[in-house]
Amino acid sequence: MSIEIPAGLTELLQGFTVEVLRHQPADLLEFALQHFTRLQQENERKGTARFGHEGRTWGDLGAAAGGGTPSKGVNFAEEPMQSDSEDGEEEEAAPADAGAFNAPVINRFTRRASVCAEAYNPDEEEDDAESRIIHPKTDDQRNRLQEACKDILLFKNLDPEQMSQVLDAMFEKLVKDGEHVIDQGDDGDNFYVIDRGTFDIYVKCDGVGRCVGNYDNRGSFGELALMYNTPRAATITATSPGALWGLDRVTFRRIIVKNNAKKRKMYESFIESLPFLKSLEFSERLKVVDVIGTKVYNDGEQIIAQGDSADSFFIVESGEVKITMKRKGKSEVEENGAVEIARCSRGQYFGELALVTNKPRAASAHAIGTVKCLAMDVQAFERLLGPCMEIMKRNIATYEEQLVALFGTNMDIVEPTA
């Protein structure tokens, strides 16, 4: 007697298993009820529920648990949103002439299944499970490495001893113009921090490819492929001679992944409570937690400055932030020539306007008292918050109304036309 397994059942159960291993729920039955109810609600909301009596299958519902319908990012057109790299390693489409490498069929659910296969639990791993790796460095090399790593969000929450271990374990990799640092479809072996040089990001999807972004002497890539045991979903190619700092998979998982697991426990509930992130799927919200960093500002300290280029997006975790804008020739201005236009408190966000419109910062932000913010860099913002973009774009109209009331003009903050 042969029993036919319904299409998609395996994927559906794998997805559930991953979530159970990740959260370790005390009440498994209640967790299962919430998990499958959430899947059903997400599919109904999108109008893509795939089960019933009209040729629909639970398999399509299972696929939705791993990523669902592709969404558009901020600076990308007509490409599916990927979310397996902090700085674009796993972005979207690649140049049509990028036939030198073959792209795998990218499905976020099947990639997540490999997490279950590896069965890595950072809560159970002993600190000394792996011997410490040390690559000797000259004073000049270590100084350059520290400078390259100082703005890497993944390292922000490491204590001094953990950071020292990371620096010891990193090794220098020199690259030539045209060299492929990582290739789409390969297994993740190292996390890379750019010391110097320029690099292009190529992605091939559905037979159509293009360059989707680039790095200019700064940035990092490759971390989420190591965190989730997923294949590379992009090719990073050097466009000039340069140098990278690499961190091996073992050290990365022992230090970064374990530290990130602690951070995830701290911030999961906070991220899920934010209304503007409701359009993200559960797995996408978890990846937001993975890429955010924490920044603390003292009273009066400037967080962003009007006219500066945009590199980060901020969510207020605690405290209050004052948003001001300079406008000459107005009597209402403060001594520094700026008018207060808004205040942001816990759960509210700022800094998104420049990222949405691709223009310099339209306003400044200062801390009122001690302020703690969650920060996300521009690459992660573009990659992970695509589904939230319509909400943020709708806010532009509100900003314009406020500016017209204050200055008699919208200050030309609207999104530029292409």
Curated annotation (Swiss-Prot):
GO terms for cellular component: cAMP-dependent protein kinase complex; centrosome; ciliary base; cytoplasm; cytosol; dendritic shaft; dendritic spine; extracellular exosome. The modification Phosphothreonine is found at residue 69. Residues 48-96 are annotated as: Disordered. Keywords: cAMP, cAMP-binding, Cell membrane, Cytoplasm, Membrane, Nucleotide-binding, Phosphoprotein, Repeat. The modification Phosphoserine is found at residues 83, 85, 114. It is found in: Cytoplasm; Cell membrane. SMART domains: cNMP, RIIa. PANTHER family: CAMP-DEPENDENT PROTEIN KINASE REGULATORY CHAIN (PTHR11635), CAMP-DEPENDENT PROTEIN KINASE TYPE II-BETA REGULATORY SUBUNIT (PTHR11635:SF156). This is cAMP-dependent protein kinase type II-beta regulatory subunit. It comes from Homo sapiens.
